[in-house]
Swiss-Prot record:
GO process annotations (BP): fatty acid biosynthetic process; secondary metabolite biosynthetic process
The name this protein goes by in its record: Beta-ketoacyl-[acyl-carrier-protein] synthase III
Active site: 122, 260, 291
A cellular component annotation (GO) from this entry: cytoplasm
Pathway participation: Lipid metabolism; fatty acid biosynthesis
Family: Belongs to the thiolase-like superfamily. FabH family.
A GO MF label: 3-oxoacyl-[acyl-carrier-protein] synthase activity
Swiss-Prot/TrEMBL domain comment: The last Arg residue of the ACP-binding site is essential for the weak association between ACP/AcpP and FabH.
Subcellular location: Cytoplasm
Name of encoding gene: fabH
Region (ACP-binding): 261-265
Provenance organism: Mycobacteroides abscessus (strain ATCC 19977 / DSM 44196 / CCUG 20993 / CIP 104536 / JCM 13569 / NCTC 13031 / TMC 1543 / L948)
Length: 340
C-alpha cells in the first residue's frame, strides 16, 4: 500500500499583529434619538454606548476588511505575498456569492492563497482565529490573516426603539503565525440552534426580492434583547471558564478581559462571574464604537493597546457570542502595539 505523506505543522502560534479600521462618521445617541422616543441617558444606562461609527455609502464590509487587513500586515512587518491564507468573518457582505475574502486577499497582495468568508455572527472573529490556528498547527498554512468586518448600519431599522442604537460599523484584523511561546490557547466554541430566532434577519432575501410592496418587510436585523441578555450573562461565563481550563490558566492569571462588545452590563456580570482579579483590565470599546459584531473583539483589543491600558504579552481572555446563537473563546497573549 502506498503511504500518503504525513503533515506536520507549527504548534506554538500567536497573534503577530493587529490592525483596525473605523469609519469616519461618528453617530451620537442624540442623532439616533431624532428617529425614536429615547434619550442619550437611557441608551447609555442600558447599553454603555455613547457613540458608534457608520460607514460611508461607498464603503462595504469588503472595503473595511481591506483597510484593517492592510494595517495588520504592515504592523506584522510583512507583505501580502507572505500571507498564506485569508479568513474574513462577516455577516454583512452584500453578496451571497462570491465571498469577499478572495477579493480582499488579492487587494492585499496575497494572490492565489486560500481565502474564504466565515459567518458566525458576533462570534465570527473567535471562530476565525480558531480555524486559523488549526490550519497552522495542521501544516496547511504558516501565516493567516484573520479579519472581522461588518457594515451593519444598512441592516438597521432606525425606527426600532429596541435595537437601532446598538450597532456600528468597523473592521479589525490580526495575523496569526509562529511565536516563541504559546500565544493562542485551545478554542472553546459551540452553538445553540434552538435559539436561532433570538438574533435574526427579518425576512429572507428570496421573499424580499419577491415582495411586490416596496413599503413591505425589509431584511432588517432584529434582536430578542431579554433572551440574548440572559443567555450571554449566565452562559458565557461558563464558556470563559472552559477556555481558561483548556489553556491551563486560572482567573488570577488573566491580565485582560476582552468580551464581545454587546452590552456593558453583560460584560460587568461576566467579569464578576469569572472571578477575575480586581486589577484585570476589561475592554469597554462599546462606549464609542457600539456593537460591531465580528469586528468587536479585535477593535476592542486595538483600543486597549493603543491607549496603553493593555500591554503586548498580557494574558487575555477573549469571548465572542451572538447570532446562531454561537460562541467562541480563547486565551491569548496580546499582540504588539499597532503603529499603523
Amino acid at each position: 500500500m502506498t503511504d500518503i505523506a504525513e503533515i506536520t505543522g507549527i504548534n506554538k502560534i500567536g497573534l503577530l499583529s493587529l490592525g483596525a479600521y473605523r469609519p469616519e462618521r461618528v453617530v451620537t445617541n442624540d442623532e439616533i434619538c431624532e428617529r425614536i422616543e429615547s434619550s442619550d441617558e437611557w441608551i447609555y444606562t442600558r447599553t454603555g454606548i455613547k457613540t458608534r461609527r457608520f460607514a460611508a455609502d461607498e464603503e462595504t464590509a469588503q472595503t473595511l476588511a481591506i483597510e484593517a487587513g492592510r494595517k495588520a500586515i504592515a504592523n506584522a512587518l510583512l507583505t501580502g505575498a507572505e500571507i498564506d491564507a485569508v479568513i474574513v468573518a462577516t455577516s454583512t457582505h452584500y453578496l451571497q456569492t462570491p465571498a469577499s475574502a478572495p477579493a480582499v486577499a488579492t487587494a492585499l497582495g496575497a494572490q492565489g492563497v486560500p481565502a474564504f468568508d466565515l459567518s458566525a455572527g458576533c462570534a465570527g472573529f473567535g471562530y476565525a482565529v480558531g480555524v486559523a490556528g488549526d490550519m497552522i498547527r495542521g501544516g496547511s498554512a504558516s501565516k493567516v490573516l484573520v479579519i472581522g468586518s461588518e457594515k451593519l448600519s444598512p441592516a438597521l431599522d432606525m425606527t426600532d426603539r429596541g435595537n437601532c442604537f446598538i450597532f456600528g460599523d468597523g473592521a479589525g484584523a490580526v495575523v496569526v503565525g509562529e511565536t516563541a511561546e504559546q500565544g493562542i490557547g485551545p478554542t472553546v466554541w459551540g452553538s445553540d440552534g434552538s435559539q436561532s430566532n433570538a438574533i435574526r434577519q427579518d425576512i429572507d432575501w428570496m421573499d424580499f426580492a419577491a415582495a411586490p410592496d416596496p413599503e413591505g418587510p425589509r431584511p432588517y436585523l432584529r434582536i430578542e434583547g431579554t433572551s440574548v441578555f440572559r443567555w450571554a450573562a449566565f452562559e458565557m461565563g461558563k464558556v470563559g471558564q472552559r477556555a481558561m481550563e483548556a489553556a491551563k490558566v486560572g482567573p488570577e492569571q488573566i491580565d485582560v478581559f476582552v468580551p464581545h462588545q454587546a452590552n456593558t452590563r453583560i460584560n460587568e456580570l461576566l467579569a464578576k462571574n469569572l472571578h477575575l482579579r480586581a486589577d484585570a483590565v476589561i475592554a469597554n470599546d462599546i462606549e464609542h464604537t457600539g456593537n460591531t459584531s465580528a469586528a468587536s473583539v479585535p477593535l476592542a483589543m486595538e483600543t486597549l493597546l493603543s491607549t496603553g491600558a493593555a500591554k503586548p504579552g498580557d494574558l487575555a481572555l477573549l469571548i465572542g457570542y451572538g447570532a446562531g446563537l454561537s460562541y467562541a473563546a480563547q486565551v491569548v497573549r496580546m499582540p504588539p502595539v499597532p503603529f499603523e
